[in-house]
């Protein structure tokens, strides 16, 4: 779980414009749904079609400690003038400095890349621990058995 005093933020993927790089407060799902319904009611134009709105389709949760860690590592990159101008304009549009913008963007992309990995390399000790966890006997879980015995909303009639 989160440490006491830690702030929880979310980056939200949107259909209309990619990822929002600056950390934003997490909005509860019920509040998001209510706001979406209100926006849909208000955005129906003369065509009867709702206006394009940004719907959260994926959340990335970051936990930021209240006391920042000491940063000792450096990262440098060579850019073309066009790349530099584009990144600077994007950082300005987000209302953040260039360093924070690039680090946040790089970290978000790194998390996405590593989350999709299919192959994990383990040390011998980690592999032994993993095999031991697989070989442990199954414990009896009555609530789980009850859940699996119940009819699912995805079951078809027939």
Curated annotation (Swiss-Prot):
Induction: Part of the probable tacA-tacT operon.
Disulfide bond annotation, renumbered to this chain: none
GO MF entries: DNA binding
Gene3D superfamilies in the record: Single helix bin
Parts forming coiled coils: none
Biological process annotations from GO: regulation of DNA-templated transcription
Knockout consequences: The tacA-tacT operon is non-essential and can be deleted without an effect on growth in cell culture.
Keyword list, A-Z: DNA-binding, Repressor, Toxin-antitoxin system, Transcription, Transcription regulation
Entry superkingdom: Bacteria
SUPFAM superfamilies: Ribbon-helix-helix (SSF47598)
Pfam families: TacA1
Role description: Antitoxin component of a type II toxin-antitoxin (TA) system. Counteracts the toxic effect of cognate toxin TacT. TacA-TacT both represses and derepresses expression of its own operon.
Family recorded in the similarity comment: Belongs to the TacA antitoxin family.
Assembly with partners or alone: Forms a complex with cognate toxin TacT.
Protein name, entry field: Antitoxin TacA
Record lineage: Bacteria, Bacillati, Actinomycetota, Actinomycetes, Mycobacteriales
């Amino acid at each position: 779980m989160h440490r006491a005093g830690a702030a929880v933020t979310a980056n939200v993927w949107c259909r209309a414009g990619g990822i929002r790089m600056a950390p934003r407060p997490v909005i509860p799902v019920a509040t998001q749904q209510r706001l979406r319904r209100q926006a849909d009611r208000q955005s129906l134009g003369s065509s009867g079609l709702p206006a394009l709105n940004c719907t959260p389709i994926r959340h990335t949760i970051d936990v930021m400690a209240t006391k920042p860690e000491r940063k000792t590592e450096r990262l440098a990159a060579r850019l073309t003038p066009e790349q530099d101008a584009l990144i600077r304009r994007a950082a300005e549009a987000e209302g953040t400095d260039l360093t924070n913008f690039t680090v946040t963007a790089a970290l978000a992309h790194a998390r996405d890349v590593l989350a999709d990995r299919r192959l994990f390399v383990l040390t011998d000790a980690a592999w032994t621990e993993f095999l031991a966890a697989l070989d442990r006997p199954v414990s009896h879980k009555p609530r789980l058995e009850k859940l699996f015995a119940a009819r699912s909303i995805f079951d078809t009639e027939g």
